[in-house]
Amino acid sequence: MANILLLDNIDSFTYNLVEQLRNQKNNVLVYRNTVSIDIIFNSLKKLTHPILMLSPGPSLPKHAGCMLDLIKKVKGDIPIVGICLGHQAIVEAYGGIIGYAGEIFHGKASLIRHDGLEMFEGVPQPLPVARYHSLICNKIPEKFVINSYFEKMIMSVRNNCDRVCGFQFHPESILTTHGDQILEKIIHWASLKYITNKKQ
């Protein structure tokens, strides 16, 4: 079980994600991105080994309330998982570049290629995933690796040192055939931040 604080970017997928995480026996707190950073940060500090999760949402990362500033405040100290808009915000907060995909993907299933490591270990290759987005990551930040693609589009990234990862696709969608398994692996991978820190 993990202690997860989910930042809600006011999206219809948020509570699908909450339900999936709670079904996996995780403790989940939800705050909207309109809540002040101080309140959210104080809640994170009260949790044992917290994970910050950033939900999907509309628009651009810079228009998503406190999200970018919150990432910058906790990165390196608290593991972060971003989905769709949350993924884009992680890339931007760490210095990467986000741009338009050239077309809108709304409820589209695509077959992605992945590296078969960490959260993708033991899942099919290629992997069917759900996509709802018009933005993509054009340039990844330093210390991040690309761990999945659709054609030439970046579909996910991870930073093994900070235990920060982002997914352009939706693991919580029924169109992502192994989404529940992937989400469990994501939470396990993020939680290793605290085990690694103890050894240092």
UniProtKB/Swiss-Prot annotation:
Pfam families: GATase (PF00117). One of its GO terms (molecular function) is anthranilate synthase activity. CDD domains: GATase1_Anthranilate_Synthase (cd01743). The active site is at 84 (nucleophile), 170 (for gatase activity), 172 (for gatase activity). One of its GO terms (biological process) is L-tryptophan biosynthetic process. It catalyses: chorismate + L-glutamine = anthranilate + pyruvate + L-glutamate + H(+). L-glutamine binds at residues 57-59, 88, 134-135. The keyword Amino-acid biosynthesis applies. Keywords: Amino-acid biosynthesis, Aromatic amino acid biosynthesis, Glutamine amidotransferase, Lyase, Plasmid, Tryptophan biosynthesis. One of its GO terms (cellular component) is cytosol. PROSITE patterns: GATASE_TYPE_1 (PS51273). Its EC number is 4.1.3.27. Pathway: Amino-acid biosynthesis; L-tryptophan biosynthesis; L-tryptophan from chorismate: step 1/5. It is an enzyme of class 4 (lyase). Residues 3-196 form the Glutamine amidotransferase type-1 domain. Heterotetramer consisting of two non-identical subunits: a beta subunit (TrpG) and a large alpha subunit (TrpE). Part of a heterotetrameric complex that catalyzes the two-step biosynthesis of anthranilate, an intermediate in the biosynthesis of L-tryptophan. In the first step, the glutamine-binding beta subunit (TrpG) of anthranilate synthase (AS) provides the glutamine amidotransferase activity which generates ammonia as a substrate that, along with chorismate, is used in the second step, catalyzed by the large alpha subunit of AS (TrpE) to produce anthranilate. In the absence of TrpG, TrpE can synthesize anthranilate directly from chorismate and high concentrations of ammonia. NCBIfam families: trpG_papA. This is Anthranilate synthase component 2.
